């Protein structure tokens, strides 16, 4: 066995040969050898199995012996305790000493002479019972028994076991309900109801062979040594009770099983997980997560939904107070604060220095506004200008470059482990000059000439468009930067702090530093990207999309345990080549990743530009109640004469056309669609003032919809103290009254015996007119399935089906809430209404009049003339029911 297993493991990397891949013919001697090997292996498997069975039987025998001994000890102790107890057996004593003797006779008479005849005389008025008996001697005995009168209790009505649902659920595809269900007719004869068609009954499948562990060993041994030819399959059929096709399928399963086990064991699941992209890692989550209910494994919309990506993304929130506080020692804001304190102390000494050489002097005038609260360094509205004057050229054109936060320079090791003493550079916007001479037009690269500072501290980590602000440069930092400067043309040549503050450097030094900066920039970029896995890069891009360039929030929420805030900031401003408006020359290094990040950043900049523009001036929109949706659709729904249409999100981009799924179905586009907010088919909510959302003036209420806080302007929900950025609660305590179903603000419903029929629903607290009572929940089934179930429910004299829309019917027979017990009445105190809540149709129960506490709830089921049960029909002479809508089955219909 050991040799065979080792040989099997060695050959596990080779796939077994297929019948057409094997040799053309097998030698008879080879088949004989294979037959002998399989027979020997079978005997070994049988002997091993026999030994295992004997061992298990012995273990079970010992365990049973211990268990029986324990039970015997318990029984013996109980017997001893019963013998020593006083009074004997209480049951025997109670039987011997009865409360009354029903029959009496002479105990002295012999047993053969007793012939008892019982006579009962009932006196219901007195509540007594006289029992008389006569023996063989002719003596009679009478015994009077006092009867106890029990109170009359009504029979408990039939009750159906049901499962509580707080929201609707869709019926499973493979669910079988009301098939072959037994019911009892009035003659109490058992009958059987099958489905409408016998084709629905699945045919019994053939039993498949279940392979044992020993059979797997035989198949694996034969396929690894001799392949999977037809001769080998025929030989295996002699040892395994299965067909050749089943053996072939089993060999494929065994190959996949052993192939996975033969993979490298040193790679952990975490390492394999990091090697994947985010799309591959979240593939199962995309199928299980519902983007409408924001839950996994949604019972309402199901799994494997069509992914609809919105064309307009929500702007990320910013301006939180907590972003000002450093999240830890690895937060780059803490390094920046330490660096700014150091610069403030040394800046006074730098300003007292006089520059005498005007031919090469640099006059710097910088005006820096306060930084934004979200620590977003390249999108703050910071205006910083630098006027550079030189004796050789004159500035003729300028443009602004983005502001960036740059970590300290260093080699590859310093990029990963940043010293706490090394501050980050804060660079402002500045003007860069462009030569207007002819020689520049004939330059090889034909680009703008950028006046870069010869400071290796900043230039070693910035791209060609990032120039440090000279006014922010401190002598100490420059001195340390010069010490860390790599070797130039002249290794003994040093640049003094005085010359660097004055800006008196030669062109040779500038060119050398510029070339050195480019080399360091490319090397640092290559190193940093190589240390970021594919999953980490995807998470970083997703963080840019959600939080902007806020390294703290990205590291805390998406890269927790993987990267620190400092590493995210370093990666953002070292390798974020897409943040520059112009492409870099080293595009081949970043590849598609730079293009993807550039797409994120461009979209982010456009969104932030719109936000900043809105802050400057309030935009007044032309909005009327007619623009909220389609008046024809709203009128049709309000009249209740046609079916409601099931909503399915469309995947249109930007504007919807004639091919839009929502337009074809006659529904409005909702917030779950992929089209933009400016789509003409989009429902834009309401702009109602206070206390107007419960009137027909509200577009949402008129269209039988509930207000949506994400769509309606003045209908928003506040829960909390505002610490998470949500809007504070209004001072007057106003809240939109058309969001009861969305917020589940239902009343307390009680369940009790009804005076009308069966069980009923009762209100606990008094309610006013049009108040929301609760939701009628249940299973979402098709109309065809509802017809099948309705036949059973009609025989049981119950109705739990509720027409929802043209695609689904609510069935609350097995799953629902307590409002399913509300009975029908021709004069109801409640009414049912179908409302569209977040794209889903839901049934709400509302008070028709004022209802007092503990009062039973009734609403009109809207039965057809011949569909209502006997207890729900109107008295003769009433013709109001004739106007009701006729249905094929007893269904509840909302108005």
UniProtKB/Swiss-Prot annotation:
Q: Which family does it belong to?
A: Belongs to the class V-like SAM-binding methyltransferase superfamily. Histone-lysine methyltransferase family. EZ subfamily.
Q: Which ranges carry the CXC domain?
A: 628-732
SUPFAM superfamilies referenced in this protein's UniProt entry, alphabetically: SET domain (SSF82199)
GO MF annotation list: chromatin binding; histone H3K27 trimethyltransferase activity
* Role description: Polycomb group (PcG) protein. Catalytic subunit of some PcG multiprotein complex, which methylates 'Lys-27' of histone H3, leading to transcriptional repression of the affected target genes. PcG proteins act by forming multiprotein complexes, which are required to maintain the transcriptionally repressive state of homeotic genes throughout development. PcG proteins are not required to initiate repression, but to maintain it during later stages of development. Involved in histone methylation and transcription regulation.
Gene Ontology biological-process entries? heterochromatin formation; methylation
Reaction(s) catalysed by this chain, per the record, are: L-lysyl(27)-[histone H3] + 3 S-adenosyl-L-methionine = N(6),N(6),N(6)-trimethyl-L-lysyl(27)-[histone H3] + 3 S-adenosyl-L-homocysteine + 3 H(+)
Provide the binding site for S-adenosyl-L-methionine.
861
Q: What is this protein called?
A: Histone-lysine N-methyltransferase EZ1
Domain of life of the source:
Eukaryota
**Subunit structure comment from the entry:** Component of the polycomb repressive complex 2 (PRC2), which methylates 'Lys-27' residues of histone H3 (H3K27me3), leading to transcriptional repression of the affected target gene.
- Which gene name does the record give? EZ1
Here the segments flagged for biased composition (Polar residues) are 383-399
On tissue specificity, the annotation reads: Expressed in roots, leaves, shoots, rachis, anthers and embryos.
KW S-adenosyl-L-methionine (keyword) present: yes
Q: Quick one: where is this thing mainly located? A: nucleus
Q: What broad taxonomic lineage does this protein's source fall under?
A: Eukaryota, Viridiplantae, Streptophyta, Embryophyta, Tracheophyta
């Amino acid at each position: 066995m050991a040799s065979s297993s080792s040989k099997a493991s060695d050959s596990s990397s080779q796939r077994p040969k297929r019948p057409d891949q094997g040799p053309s013919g097998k030698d008879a001697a080879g088949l004989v050898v294979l037959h002998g090997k399989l027979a020997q292996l079978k005997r070994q498997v049988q002997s091993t199995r026999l030994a295992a069975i004997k061992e298990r039987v012995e273990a079970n025998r010992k365990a049973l012996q211990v268990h029986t001994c324990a039970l015997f000890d318990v029984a013996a102790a109980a017997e001893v305790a019963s013998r020593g107890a006083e009074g004997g057996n209480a049951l025997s004593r109670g039987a011997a000493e009865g409360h009354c003797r029903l029959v009496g006779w002479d105990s002295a008479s012999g047993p053969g002479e007793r012939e008892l005849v019982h006579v009962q005389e009932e006196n219901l008025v007195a509540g007594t019972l006289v029992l008389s008996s006569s023996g063989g001697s002719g003596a009679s005995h009478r015994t009077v028994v006092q009867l106890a009168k029990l109170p009359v209790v009504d029979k408990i009505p039939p009750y159906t076991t049901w499962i509580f649902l707080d929201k609707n659920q869709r019926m499973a595809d493979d669910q079988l309900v009301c098939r072959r269900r037994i019911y009892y007719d009035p003659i109490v004869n058992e009958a059987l109801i099958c489905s409408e068609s016998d084709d629905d009954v699945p045919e019994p499948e053939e039993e498949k062979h279940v392979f044992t562990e020993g059979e797997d060993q035989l198949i694996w041994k034969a396929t690894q040594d001799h392949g999977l030819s037809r001769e080998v399959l025929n030989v295996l059929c002699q040892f395994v009770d299965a067909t050749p096709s089943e053996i072939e399928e089993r060999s494929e399963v065994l190959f996949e099983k052993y192939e996975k086990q033969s993979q490298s064991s040193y790679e952990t699941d975490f390492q394999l997980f990091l090697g994947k992209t985010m799309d591959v890692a979240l593939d199962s989550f995309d199928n299980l997560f519902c983007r409408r209910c924001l839950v996994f494994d949604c019972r309402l919309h199901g799994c494997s939904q069509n992914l609809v990506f919105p064309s307009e993304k929500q702007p990320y929130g910013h301006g939180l107070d907590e972003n000002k506080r450093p999240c830890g020692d690895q937060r780059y804001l803490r390094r920046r604060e330490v660096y700014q304190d150091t610069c403030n102390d040394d800046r006074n000494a730098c300003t007292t220095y006089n520059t005498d050489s005007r031919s090469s002097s640099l006059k710097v005038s910088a005006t820096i506004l306060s930084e934004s609260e979200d620590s977003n360094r390249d999108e703050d509205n910071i205006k910083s200008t630098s006027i550079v004057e030189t004796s050789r050229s004159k500035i003729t054109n300028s443009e602004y470059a983005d502001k960036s936060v740059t970590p300290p320079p260093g080699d590859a090791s310093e990029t990963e482990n940043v010293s706490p003493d090394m501050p980050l550079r804060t660079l402002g916007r500045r003007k860069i000059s462009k030569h207007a001479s002819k020689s520049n037009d004939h330059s090889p690269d034909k680009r703008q000439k950028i006046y870069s500072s010869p400071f290796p501290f900043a230039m070693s980590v910035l791209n060609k468009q990032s120039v440090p602000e000279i006014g922010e440069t401190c002598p100490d930092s420059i001195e340390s930067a010069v010490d860390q400067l790599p070797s130039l043309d002249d290794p003994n040549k040093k640049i003094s702090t005085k010359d660097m503050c004055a800006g008196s450097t030669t062109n040779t030094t500038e060119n050398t530093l510029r070339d050195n900066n480019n080399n360091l920039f490319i090397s640092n970029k290559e190193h940093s990207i190589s240390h970021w896995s594919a999953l980490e890069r995807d998470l970083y891009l997703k963080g840019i999309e959600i939080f902007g360039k806020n390294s703290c929030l990205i590291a805390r929420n998406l890269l927790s345990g993987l990267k620190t805030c400092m590493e995210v900031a370093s990666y953002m401003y070292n390798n974020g080549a897409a943040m520059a408006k112009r492409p870099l020359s080293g595009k081949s290094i970043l590849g598609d990743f730079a293009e993807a990040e550039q797409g994120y950043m461009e979209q982010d900049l456009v969104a932030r530009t719109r936000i900043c523009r809105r802050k400057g001036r309030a935009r007044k929109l032309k909005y009327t109640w007619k623009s909220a949706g389609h008046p024809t659709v709203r009128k049709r729904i309000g009249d209740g004469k046609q079916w409601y249409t099931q909503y399915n999100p469309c995947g249109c981009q930007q504007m919807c056309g004639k091919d839009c799924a929502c337009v074809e179905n006659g529904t409005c586009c909702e917030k779950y669609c992929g089209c933009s907010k400016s789509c003409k088919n989009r429902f834009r909510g309401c702009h109602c003032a206070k206390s107007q959302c419960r009137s027909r003036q509200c577009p949402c209420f008129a269209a039988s919809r509930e207000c949506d806080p994400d769509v309606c302007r003045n209908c928003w929900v506040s829960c909390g103290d505002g610490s998470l950025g949500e809007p504070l609660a209004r001072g007057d305590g106003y809240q939109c009254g058309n969001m009861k179903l969305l917020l589940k603000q239902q009343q307390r419903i009680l369940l009790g015996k009804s005076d009308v029929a069966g069980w009923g629903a009762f209100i606990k607290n008094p309610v006013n007119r049009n108040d929301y009572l609760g939701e009628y929940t249940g299973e979402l089934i098709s109309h065809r399935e509802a017809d099948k179930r309705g036949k059973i429910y009609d025989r049981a004299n119950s109705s739990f089906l509720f027409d929802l829309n043209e695609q689904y019917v609510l069935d609350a027979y097995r799953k629902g809430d307590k409002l399913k017990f509300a009975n029908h009445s021709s004069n109801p105190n409640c009414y049912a209404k179908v409302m569209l809540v977040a794209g889903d149709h839901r049934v709400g129960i509302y008070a028709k009049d004022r209802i007092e506490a503990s009062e039973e709830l009734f609403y009109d089921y809207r039965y057809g003339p011949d569909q209502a049960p006997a207890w729900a029909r109107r008295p003769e002479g009433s013709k109001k029911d004739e106007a009701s809508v006729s249905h094929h089955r007893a269904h509840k219909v909302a108005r």
